[in-house]
Amino acid sequence: SLSAAETTMNHATALSTYVEALNTHSWDRIAPHVGADAVFIFTEDTFIGHAAAKAAFEKTFKLIENEVFSLHDIVWTVVMDDVATCHYEFRWKGLISGQEASGGGRGTSILRKVDGRWLIAHEHLGPYPRK
């Protein structure tokens, strides 16, 4: 059964709650926010479903210690009863081999409402445009 917070959560709150979960670096905390057949398109590959996504996220968490991931300038382009899509700038910072590192780019997310809960259905993260 859903908590009161989950049933009243809208698409925007669901996205920010997902980002909070990402910053725990725990797949067990992230997974409840991700659809079973979610697609993640990252620079290195495309990952479909929980098992593939878990492996990709855990590889990143090992590579970037203490990573903090954030979204900026979120624009919701389509919001319907059970689907919402947005684009944004993402940023990350952390330690790679003990050295401070950071980066970012542009992203698109599609959330789908499943059994009353907004879940990540699709996430595409890519570089900033070449100037």
Mark where each language-model region is.
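Boundary at the C-terminal end of the N-terminal hydrophobic targeting segment
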Residues: 4-5
